[in-house]
């Protein structure tokens, strides 16, 4: 945004004085939307949202809003630990969840819960994991997510974006990237 300081130091009305900036840091005419506005837009445009529920936010409040706007079918919630994931599942057993499964230990903790694997997308971190983890996740029917934001995106850019296909072939199903167009092109994804 064109604002400074922490977001939580402003009221929403004060935030409306700021504009969003684009990827090149150029000011746009767009204001900060409310979560409810984003849900309405996503439903209307058939867009899938990954909703990042930070630890300081009560997952029940977010799920209440998702349900109120009948947006369960376009919402994937990002959870950070087993407790948060279990709470989310109890509140909304039909929601798809991005769960932390960066190693076998985290995966085993998730498997010991009552959450069906059909509700899970496994976030495997921002570094490549051992191939065995991806194999184990796929055997369970769980899709994998690799966060290439930052370091891995820079590595891909330096290698003519060929790394995106290498990572996909290693077992990555979803790439969370700051370079979506380059990744899609490298993966030969066309609209």
For the regions a language model picked out, list residue spans one by one.
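Metal-dependent phosphodiesterase/phospholipase catalytic core, i.e.
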Residues: 1-105, 117-118, 124, 138-140, ...
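C-terminal active-site rim and adjoining tail of enzyme catalytic domains
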Residues: 25-29, 100-101, 108-191
């Amino acid at each position: 945004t064109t604002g400074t300081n922490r977001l939580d130091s402003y009221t929403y009305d004060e935030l409306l004085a700021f504009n969003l900036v684009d990827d090149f840091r150029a000011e746009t005419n767009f204001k900060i939307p409310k979560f409810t506005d984003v849900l309405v837009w996503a439903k209307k445009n058939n867009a899938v949202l990954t909703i990042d529920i930070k630890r300081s936010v009560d997952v029940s409040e977010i799920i209440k809003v998702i349900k109120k706007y009948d947006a369960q079918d376009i919402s994937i919630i990002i959870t950070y630990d087993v407790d948060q994931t279990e709470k989310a599942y109890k509140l909304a057993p039909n929601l798809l969840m991005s769960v932390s499964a960066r190693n076998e230990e985290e995966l085993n903790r998730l498997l010991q819960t009552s959450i069906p694997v059909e509700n899970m997308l496994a976030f495997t971190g921002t570094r490549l994991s051992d191939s065995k983890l991806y194999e184990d996740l796929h055997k369970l029917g769980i899709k994998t997510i690799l966060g290439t934001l930052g370091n891995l995106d820079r590595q891909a850019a330096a290698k003519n974006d060929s790394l995106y296909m290498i990572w996909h072939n290693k077992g990555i199903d979803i790439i969370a990237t700051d370079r979506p167009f380059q990744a899609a092109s490298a993966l030969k994804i066309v609209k």
